[in-house]
């Protein structure tokens, strides 16, 4: 019979995605196997050949390293998420290009006549890249997993890529019947000779330890990202969220903050809409809020509390227009239905309605029969959709960045702005809840947002949802247009970068997944046996086609 032997390269001794499909035994040994050790090993004195040049440029080769060590580094990097680490990502891409004979500027193949063909030249640019990539490797090594794992031996079926599977006796027996008893001998040999802090320690394994069938040979927990699973990857939730934020930039980009509207015709803006807005200004510089003033007269006789003006009965309201030449106020009385309109839509309005109201004492009767307040009202553009009264629109004057106008004329402008914003938002955002979830990943930015710009992440969400008019209603902001541009040009791109990073809370130890899966099968077995009285509840069949493929090479 052909003997079976097993050789494990050091780069395979970690918990994670298998580096070569032919190797199935995965072990842990933290003190010896780290990502940093790969970088250090490449440039040790015994593994390099120095070839200093008198005049060196970026493409000059000053050092030769072993090709085998570069291949192992590339294999190791396949199990590491480097998307947020730029330098190590460049090394990874350069290695991929080099091994596939694509053009790159880091590694150079050396003719056999000059030096051993097992060596590869590294350019000056490449050495600089390696130095920065090592800092990235140190960043990866700082990622620690708090949950310890312990156990016996883990075999990794090829058909379950990225998942460790603890094989119990019933499964081993099934595999043995399919591909022969040599498998059982190999597994038994591995159990007795290799370190064993891997996967989970099951009750069956503990029992085997007591009987002396298995022996733990020490070993350590290898705490690295590959020993965990990112839960958001199930169902492609992370890809979906990233896709949503990529679409966000279709509309929420610098064109809103820096490009005049007349250059956005037939892109964001219809030709008919451009006639109602200022084409020489950017979209964020348009008339998003309108400001107007009223004078309220209250009947003091009905006052209930001495310190609460809201308990007065609102008797009369006049729309107040200041004549800039004479500084005199022109008052338009809102009586009858107009008074009711004011009471229902403005008097008790809240910020959630897109309206901000400031009241100041204007006049108080000597006989204490009435009191008057000067009321300043800020309308966000989207608020006018709720406030409809055509008769009042023509008598109320508002101030906007486009000049002074009646409310009905401003309503026409506001409707266009709201329509464009809604169209852009609908184009960019299909599932707004995912945008909210993505922005919540940037909670660490909250303090800086408040310190620098006096806004919160909730304000950013409301800005996306409602438009710049929302920022105009925030009394804490002195220049809402500037903040709107900063959100578009700086804050949103920063938040999007956070979406690409894995949330530590979403990571779960692979051993936890294995334990829960084993317990699920155990519970279902008990359920089946109790309901049928049968003992054949093993879900593993002896059909070779239904078993995960395990490759074992004979030598």
Swiss-Prot record:
Pfam families: Fiji_64_capsid. InterPro entries: S10. It is found in: Virion. Keywords: Capsid protein, Virion. GO terms for cellular component: viral capsid. Its main location: virion. This is Putative outer capsid protein p10. It comes from Fiji disease virus (isolate Sugarcane) (FDV). The gene is S10.
């Amino acid at each position: 019979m052909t003997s079976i032997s097993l050789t494990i390269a050091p780069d395979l001794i970690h918990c994670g995605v298998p580096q070569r499909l032919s190797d199935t035994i995965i072990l842990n040994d933290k003190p010896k196997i780290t990502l940093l050790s790969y970088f250090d090993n490449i440039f040790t004195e015994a593994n390099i050949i120095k070839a200093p040049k008198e005049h060196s440029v970026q493409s000059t080769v000053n050092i030769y390293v072993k090709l085998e060590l570069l291949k192992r580094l590339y294999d190791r990097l396949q199990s590491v998420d480097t998307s947020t680490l730029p330098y190590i990502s460049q090394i990874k891409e350069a290695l991929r290009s080099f091994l596939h004979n694509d053009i790159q500027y880091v590694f150079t193949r050396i003719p056999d006549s000059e030096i051993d063909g097992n060596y590869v030249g590294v350019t000056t640019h490449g050495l600089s890249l390696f130095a920065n990539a090592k800092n990235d490797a140190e960043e990866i090594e700082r990622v620690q997993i708090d949950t310890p794992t312990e156990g016996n031996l883990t075999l990794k079926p090829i058909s379950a890529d990225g998942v460790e599977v603890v094989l119990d006796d019933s499964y081993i027996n099934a595999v043995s019947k399919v591909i022969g008893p040599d498998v059982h001998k190999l597994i038994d040999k591995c159990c007795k000779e290799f370190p064993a802090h891997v996967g989970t320690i099951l009750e069956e394994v503990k029992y085997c330890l007591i009987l002396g069938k298995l022996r733990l040979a020490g070993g350590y927990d290898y705490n690295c990202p590959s020993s965990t699973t990112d839960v958001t990857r199930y169902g492609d939730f992370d890809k979906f969220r990233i896709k949503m934020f990529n679409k966000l930039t279709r509309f929420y980009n610098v064109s809103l903050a820096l490009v005049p509207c007349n250059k956005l015709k037939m892109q964001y803006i219809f030709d008919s809409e451009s006639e109602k807005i200022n084409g020489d200004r950017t979209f964020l510089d348009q008339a998003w809020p309108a400001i107007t003033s009223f004078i309220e007269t209250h009947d003091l006789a009905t006052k209930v509390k001495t310190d609460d003006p809201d308990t007065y009965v609102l008797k009369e309201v006049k729309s107040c227009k200041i004549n800039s030449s004479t500084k005199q106020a022109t008052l338009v009385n809102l009586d009858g239905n107009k008074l009711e309109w004011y009471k229902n839509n403005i008097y008790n309005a809240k910020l959630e309605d897109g309206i901000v109201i400031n009241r100041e004492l204007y006049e108080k009767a000597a006989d204490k029969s009435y009191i008057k307040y000067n009321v300043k009202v800020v309308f966000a553009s989207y608020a006018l959709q709720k406030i409809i009264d055509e008769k009042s629109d023509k008598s109320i004057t508002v101030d906007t960045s486009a000049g002074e106008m009646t409310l009905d004329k401003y309503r026409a402008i506001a409707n266009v702005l709201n329509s464009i914003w809604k169209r852009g938002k609908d184009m960019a955002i299909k599932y707004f809840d995912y945008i909210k979830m993505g922005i919540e990943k940037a909670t660490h930015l909250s303090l800086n947002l408040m310190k620098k710009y006096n806004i919160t992440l909730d304000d950013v969400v409301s800005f996306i949802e409602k438009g710049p008019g929302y920022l105009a209603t925030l009394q804490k902001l002195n220049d809402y247009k500037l903040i709107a541009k900063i959100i578009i040009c700086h804050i949103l791109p920063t938040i999007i970068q956070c979406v690409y990073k894995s949330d530590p809370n979403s990571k779960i130890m692979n051993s936890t997944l294995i334990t829960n899966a084993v317990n699920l099968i155990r519970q279902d077995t008990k359920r089946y046996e109790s309901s049928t009285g049968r003992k054949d509840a093993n879900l593993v069949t002896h059909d070779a086609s239904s078993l995960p493929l395990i490759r074992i090479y004979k030598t």
